[in-house]
Amino acid sequence: MAREKRVETNPFIFDRPLPPEDLVDREDELAVLAERTRDVVNTRLSSPRDYGKTSLLQRTIADARAAGVGAVLVDLYGVRTAGQMAAQIERAYEALPTGPLRSAWNGLRRHGGSIGVQSPLGGASVAVGAGEAGERVLLDCLDLPYRLHERTGQRVLVAFDEFQVVLKMQLDALIRSVIQHHGRGVNYVFSGSHPGMMLSLFVDRKRPFYGQAAPLELGRLPRVALADYIVDRFEQTGRDAGKALGWLLDLVDGHPQRAMLFAHLLWRHTEPGAEAGEAAWLGAYEDAWGYLQGDFEASWDSLSVVEAGVIDAVAAGVQGLTGKAGREIFGLPPGSSAHEAAKRLVGQGMLVRSGSGRDAVLSLVDPVFARWVVAGRRWALLD
């Protein structure tokens, strides 16, 4: 009887958060978050989209649990009402692993302590939407970690992912009115992927969360750590990243999601026992356009005329947006319009500003998008 050929699973995940054990580097950020968890210091974690923020949070939750801290991750993506936020909070507690905190949570539910929210997938008895009813339920939900801490004596870490949505719902005052009383029993990570909205929440003196959390910015991955990660996984599956590795690293320039996408495609084009060379790289590069086209074209089409000019100029390495090159080559207007557009693009997470004052440098968050822009919005390899 012929033996079945074993089909290997591609080791590079690009379309969802990485499992905690597969996180790429982030040792410095993990150390900061672990220290703040020990010291009960709240954190506002901000990063552009696709920089691995959720993967980092999942690893932080896993590490906290291993250290004896009760920890939950609340996903607020797509939440539009107080009732929906309450449902997501209860859903996070439903995912608690077996242990004292889980037992305390089950006890609350058995003795009428359930908040009674209908989550998107079902699971409780009463549907709550917008308005005062939703806010009353949310108040109870927000107090859950402290109630569990009182029952168990165990400290609790709560990580809110996509926390910027509370700004749209104008719920930041309500949230702070509850959690400010939790003392040293509970601490929080407020994570968001819209830099401008996160700044509005935590840096605007008029907002309730002003000064309530220590900042932590998530940047690109170090080249050496990323190279080691890719090489290790190629070797573990009987392949060699070869000279294509350098081309990949040059292209993605530390962008976490783009690195995983191109590594995934390069691995697919590399036969077992083979080295990834030019043919494999060209195949991976060609395939990538099918994954990126919709995102790139939608991003470009969303820009105003001035914003498009700013993106064009910055992608080409121009920093003086109102200088001769900005005006004559990229059609940027005189005055403050170009700088205001750049500020908006930084807030939206399309541009990032490094340094300050005269030394400040603008660059595109996504280096692969930048290459596409420089190529005249064509998908082509550049020399």
Residue ranges of each PLM-predicted region?
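C-terminal leucine-rich, beta-strand-based interaction scaffolds used for sensing/assembly
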Residues: 2-10, 290-383
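Short, locally clustered residues in the helix-turn-helix/winged-helix DNA-binding domain
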Residues: 37-38, 253, 267, 312-319
